[in-house]
Design a protein with these regions (language model features):
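Long hydrophobic alpha-helical segments that form multi-pass transmembrane helix bundles
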Residues: 106-192
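Central hydrophobic cores of alpha-helical transmembrane segments in multi-pass inner-membrane proteins
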Residues: 19, 38-49, 64-65, 85-93
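Structural signature of hydrophobic alpha-helical transmembrane segments
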Residues: 27-41, 75-84, 180-189
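Short, amphipathic, aromatic/basic-enriched membrane-interface segments that mark the entry/exit
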Residues: 1-10, 48-57, 74-76, 177-185
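N-terminal signal-anchor module of multipass membrane proteins
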Residues: 1-47
Length: 200
């Protein structure tokens, strides 16, 4: 609403993202929550370390971390998600002077940095709802720059990947419900629309 403070607006956005994170966790298990938490931790730590104006509590860094995490695959090593949050806040936001001064979206800049640096990891998408819920969906706890180990996980093509390479469409119901491979935030289109309407 008009006249709302910046922190109120930011934390309202965080609240609107919570159902999407919860649904990603339902589909991809604890890996989803770990990846979002690591990206958010990287963003918050960087905001706290580099910005001395007490902006950590306004919620903008938390939004950056959560949005970044939702653009990542569930099986991503947590250290990659963390440095994505560091890059997004440090280079995408604070270098330009902080909130409202940035030229690029910090979350997407962090995603672009990770995509350029670790293209294979960023395009390996575990299939949703495969195996026991509590099983990690990838190599979340891999050491930085260690050789990837063989993973007992099922991967799948994203809807766009299926269309491009297999010339197959994705059933509309799968897109609505979120039972497709992809990034954590590519879950249920219906839930995403409902969360967006909450902000309208």
């Amino acid at each position: 609403a008009a006249g709302d403070s910046t922190p109120k607006i930011m934390w309202t956005v965080v609240a609107s993202l919570a159902p999407i994170v919860a649904l990603a966790t339902y589909f991809f298990g604890p890996s989803a929550l770990l990846v979002v938490a690591a990206a958010t931790a990287g963003a918050l730590v960087t905001e706290r370390a580099l910005d001395r104006r007490g902006t950590l509590r306004d919620g903008s860094a938390a939004i950056t971390g959560i949005l970044l995490g939702l653009t990542l695959p569930a099986g991503l090593p947590l250290w990659m998600a963390f440095i994505g949050g560091v890059f997004g806040i440090g280079i995408g936001k604070l270098v330009f002077g902080g909130l409202g001064q940035n030229v690029f979206n910090p979350a997407l800049l962090g995603r672009a940095f990770l995509q350029a640096s670790f293209p294979v990891a960023l395009t390996t998408f575990p299939a949703p709802a495969t195996g026991p819920w509590w099983r990690l969906r990838g190599d979340n706890f891999a050491w930085p720059f260690a050789s990837p180990r063989a993973l007992d996980t099922v991967t799948g093509a994203t809807p766009l990947g299926r269309m491009k390479f297999d010339h197959q469409g994705t059933p509309l119901l799968d897109l609505v419900l979120g039972t497709t491979s992809g990034s954590l935030g590519e879950t249920s289109g219906l839930v995403i629309l409902l969360c967006g309407s909450y902000l309208a």
